[in-house]
């Protein structure tokens, strides 16, 4: 197969996954945005975590809220728990890598805050512990997952929201996660500041 054909095949796979996800995920993305808006209106904040590419997604989400998405508006409170290398490495060294997010959540999380927990498999041990810590702090969890939802899905409470991408290929799940994050940012802005359309 020549390279351009391979590229077209990858684009097509991404398009098909997004089309399937659009039908399945729209109500869950809407619900998650409402949970986030409610928290923000009640002086809550967003905490976000993930590993690898999902760590990048957590930072992307928090930067869109702290700075701006597609319009000028006041900054919104969001913290990516993936950015402080001194904190992360000290927790990993002194305790366990599985606690790098949960210890931060226990210190920073407050009742009514929202945790955006991102894992393509749903089985990342440190994300599972983060969800448990968020529940201990009476936070609501929005989980971005894929495949069968993994261990994360079984931990979620009725007030939590799972946005589970209907795919098994990690790259396709990540692509939909980013689109879902952009949808969340757009819906948060439109609910808080009005629609620009």
UniProtKB/Swiss-Prot annotation:
<feature type="binding site">
    <location>
        <position position="174"/>
    </location>
    <ligand>
        <name>Zn(2+)</name>
    </ligand>
</feature>
<dbReference type="GO" id="GO:0008270">
    <property type="term" value="F:zinc ion binding"/>
</dbReference>
<protein>
    <recommendedName>
        <fullName>Phosphoheptose isomerase</fullName>
        <ecNumber>5.3.1.28</ecNumber>
    </recommendedName>
</protein>
<dbReference type="GO" id="GO:0005975">
    <property type="term" value="P:carbohydrate metabolic process"/>
</dbReference>
<dbReference type="Pfam" id="PF13580">
    <property type="entry name" value="SIS_2"/>
</dbReference>
<keyword id="KW-0479">Metal-binding</keyword>
<comment type="similarity">
    <text>Belongs to the SIS family. GmhA subfamily.</text>
</comment>
<dbReference type="GO" id="GO:0005737">
    <property type="term" value="C:cytoplasm"/>
</dbReference>
<keyword id="KW-0862">Zinc</keyword>
<dbReference type="GO" id="GO:2001061">
    <property type="term" value="P:D-glycero-D-manno-heptose 7-phosphate biosynthetic process"/>
</dbReference>
<feature type="binding site">
    <location>
        <position position="64"/>
    </location>
    <ligand>
        <name>Zn(2+)</name>
    </ligand>
</feature>
<feature type="binding site">
    <location>
        <begin position="119"/>
        <end position="121"/>
    </location>
    <ligand>
        <name>substrate</name>
    </ligand>
</feature>
<dbReference type="InterPro" id="IPR046348">
    <property type="entry name" value="SIS_dom_sf"/>
</dbReference>
<feature type="binding site">
    <location>
        <begin position="93"/>
        <end position="94"/>
    </location>
    <ligand>
        <name>substrate</name>
    </ligand>
</feature>
<keyword id="KW-0413">Isomerase</keyword>
<dbReference type="GO" id="GO:0097367">
    <property type="term" value="F:carbohydrate derivative binding"/>
</dbReference>
<dbReference type="InterPro" id="IPR035461">
    <property type="entry name" value="GmhA/DiaA"/>
</dbReference>
<feature type="binding site">
    <location>
        <begin position="51"/>
        <end position="53"/>
    </location>
    <ligand>
        <name>substrate</name>
    </ligand>
</feature>
<comment type="function">
    <text>Catalyzes the isomerization of sedoheptulose 7-phosphate in D-glycero-D-manno-heptose 7-phosphate.</text>
</comment>
<feature type="binding site">
    <location>
        <position position="182"/>
    </location>
    <ligand>
        <name>Zn(2+)</name>
    </ligand>
</feature>
<dbReference type="InterPro" id="IPR001347">
    <property type="entry name" value="SIS_dom"/>
</dbReference>
<comment type="pathway">
    <text>Carbohydrate biosynthesis; D-glycero-D-manno-heptose 7-phosphate biosynthesis; D-glycero-alpha-D-manno-heptose 7-phosphate and D-glycero-beta-D-manno-heptose 7-phosphate from sedoheptulose 7-phosphate: step 1/1.</text>
</comment>
<feature type="domain" description="SIS">
    <location>
        <begin position="36"/>
        <end position="197"/>
    </location>
</feature>
<dbReference type="GO" id="GO:0008968">
    <property type="term" value="F:D-sedoheptulose 7-phosphate isomerase activity"/>
</dbReference>
<feature type="binding site">
    <location>
        <position position="124"/>
    </location>
    <ligand>
        <name>substrate</name>
    </ligand>
</feature>
<keyword id="KW-0119">Carbohydrate metabolism</keyword>
<feature type="binding site">
    <location>
        <position position="64"/>
    </location>
    <ligand>
        <name>substrate</name>
    </ligand>
</feature>
<comment type="subunit">
    <text>Homotetramer.</text>
</comment>
<keyword id="KW-0963">Cytoplasm</keyword>
<feature type="binding site">
    <location>
        <position position="60"/>
    </location>
    <ligand>
        <name>Zn(2+)</name>
    </ligand>
</feature>
<dbReference type="InterPro" id="IPR050099">
    <property type="entry name" value="SIS_GmhA/DiaA_subfam"/>
</dbReference>
<dbReference type="InterPro" id="IPR004515">
    <property type="entry name" value="Phosphoheptose_Isoase"/>
</dbReference>
<feature type="binding site">
    <location>
        <position position="174"/>
    </location>
    <ligand>
        <name>substrate</name>
    </ligand>
</feature>
């Amino acid at each position: 197969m020549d390279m351009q054909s391979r590229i077209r095949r990858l684009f097509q796979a991404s398009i098909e996954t997004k089309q399937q996800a659009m039908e399945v995920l729209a109500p869950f993305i809407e619900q998650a945005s409402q949970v986030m808006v409610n928290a923000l209106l009640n002086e809550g904040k967003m905490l976000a975590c993930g590993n690898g590419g999902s760590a990048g997604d957590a930072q992307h989400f928090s930067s869109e809220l702290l700075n701006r998405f597609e319009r000028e508006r006041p900054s919104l409170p969001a913290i990516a728990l993936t950015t402080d290398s001194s904190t992360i490495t000290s927790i990993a060294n002194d305790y366990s890598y599985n606690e790098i997010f949960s210890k931060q959540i226990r210190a920073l999380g407050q009742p009514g805050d929202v945790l955006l927990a991102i894992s393509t498999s749903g089985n990342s041990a440190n994300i599972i512990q983060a969800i448990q810590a968020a529940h201990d702090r009476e936070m609501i969890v929005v989980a971005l997952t894929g495949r069968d939802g993994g261990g994360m899905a079984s931990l979620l409470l009725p007030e939590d929201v799972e946005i589970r991408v209907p795919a098994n290929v990690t790259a396709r799940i990540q692509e939909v996660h980013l689109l879902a994050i952009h949808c969340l940012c757009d819906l948060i802005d439109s609910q808080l500041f009005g629609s620009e359309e």
